[in-house]
Amino acid sequence: MRKTVIAGNWKMHMTCSSAKEYIDKFIPFSKEFPSDRHVVIAPPFTAISTLASLLQGTNIQLSSQNVHWEDTGAFTAEISPSMLLEHDVRYAIVGHSEPRKYFSESDEQINLRARSAQSNGLIPIVCVGESIEQRERGEAERVIRRQVEQGLEQTDLTKLVIAYEPIWAIGTGKTCESNEANRICGLIREWAGFSDLIIQYGGSVKPANIDEIMSMSDIDGVLVGGASLDPENFARIANYQSI
């Protein structure tokens, strides 16, 4: 049985004080979430400690926005699994299109991050997705398959989440058609060779389209960017209604 994972990625937003204001508003909404939905927030690293304290005793889990493959060392600007575990972090996003784009992260590095997360008890959320140029050239499936096969090598597929995020839909207001997103998620599950693989969709997810997205048979959750920055909007997404 595949579980439902609804994750909000705050990216480089929210100070500790604004994060506290957000959580104070969000927690009352969270009491209405169905018990079988795993709701996750990925704040910036500076706010993790604050949220860890505020979320104690709630049904909301923490994720980091990245994790390094070494536990200590001369890796400026990185964060290790043990640093995250100290603050009750449960998930770690790896391979998001922004680090891939701005810091030239390779599939091999993303695989190292995912394996490090798993070996330390974190659940990696491994992001994959194509650019608009790759899609227009008919390369989308080849690109995503490579990301899946290289990114998941030597990982435990029972203890990770895949997030399909077409790059052209992230922060643009353009959403991949639900049927097409569902088709790609089905292919990802096929390429991975594991029918119970948990797969999210990400890319301009918002309250107006969440019910349709979550009605798709091969989509198990969402990775939300901009819409997760508003507590009421993210609560509506987490409390989606099945069609």
Curated annotation (Swiss-Prot):
> Which positions does UniProt annotate for substrate binding?
9-11, 171, 204, 225-226
Function summary: Involved in the gluconeogenesis. Catalyzes stereospecifically the conversion of dihydroxyacetone phosphate (DHAP) to D-glyceraldehyde-3-phosphate (G3P).
Give the CC-aspect GO terms: cytosol
Q: Which is one Pfam family of this protein?
A: TIM
Location in the cell reads:
Cytoplasm
Which SUPFAM superfamilies does the record associate with it?
A: Triosephosphate isomerase (TIM)
Where does this chain mainly localize?
cytoplasm
Residue numbers annotated as active site: 96, 165
State the family named in the UniProt similarity comment for this chain: Belongs to the triosephosphate isomerase family.
The identity of this protein, by name, is Triosephosphate isomerase
> Which one GO biological process term can you cite for this protein?
glyceraldehyde-3-phosphate biosynthetic process
SS bond list: none
Subunit organization: Homodimer.
Q: What class of enzyme is it?
A: isomerase
Q: Might you give the EC number(s) for this enzyme?
A: 5.3.1.1
Which keywords does UniProt give here? Cytoplasm, Gluconeogenesis, Glycolysis, Isomerase
Metabolic or biological pathway = Carbohydrate biosynthesis; gluconeogenesis; Carbohydrate degradation; glycolysis; D-glyceraldehyde 3-phosphate from glycerone phosphate: step 1/1
Q: Which gene encodes it?
A: tpiA
